[in-house]
UniProtKB/Swiss-Prot annotation:
Protein name: Protein AimP
Tree of life domain: Viruses
Signal peptide positions on this chain: 1-30
GO biological process, alphabetically ordered: latency-replication decision
Phylogenetic placement of the source organism: Viruses, Duplodnaviria, Heunggongvirae, Uroviricota, Caudoviricetes
Record GO cellular component, one term: extracellular region
Site-annotated residues for Cleavage: A37, S38
Keyword Membrane: no
Keywords attached to this entry: Latency-replication decision, Secreted, Signal
């Protein structure tokens, strides 16, 4: 169950970073790293 939850967290983080990338391409990679790091800390 933890793997499934962690997978969902990663997918959500990627979706958020993708939307952020659509709004601002120049900061897409930076916001992606921050989002993933926050997701890992939360899990």
């Amino acid at each position: 169950m933890k793997k499934v939850f962690f997978g969902l967290v990663i997918l959500t983080a990627l979706a958020i970073s993708f939307v952020a990338g659509q709004q601002s391409v120049s900061t897409a990679s930076a916001s992606d790293e921050v989002t993933v790091a926050s997701a890992i800390r939360g899990a």
